[in-house]
Amino acid sequence: MPGLDGDWELQRLSGVLPPLAGMHKQIRGDRGATVLPGGLRVPFAVVAHELRYRPPFSMVVDVLEAEGGGWHGRATVFGQTVGEFRMSRRAT
């Protein structure tokens, strides 16, 4: 199973997620951020295989499952799945 530490490319798979082009996730230990185009960071805490966003987005949790060399994610709002995405390690 791959670890979560690192920099991750995002690919939208389904749901009401916006296009994820130009967005990526950076994860270091128990914290990380989704980095939006232009560099704006949306921080989250890493708890097991969940990315729990900090206020004002604390109703959002990304639930991750290992898939191949990356991760399959379900974006949830108030516990309801609103979209799915794939995380692949960024080339260095």
Segments (PLM) and residue ranges:
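Mature soluble binding/inhibitory domains
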Residues: 1-3, 67-72, 87-92
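Tryptophan-anchored aromatic micro-motifs
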Residues: 1-37, 73-75
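Residues that flank catalytic or metal-binding motifs in active/ligand-binding sites
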Residues: 4, 60, 83
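Edge beta-strand at a domain terminus
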Residues: 7, 77-92
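Residues in well-ordered beta-strands of folded domains
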Residues: 9-11, 52, 88
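Contiguous, well-ordered beta-strand patches that form the walls/edges
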Residues: 16, 29-70
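Beta-turn initiation residues at beta-strand->coil junctions
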Residues: 55, 75-77
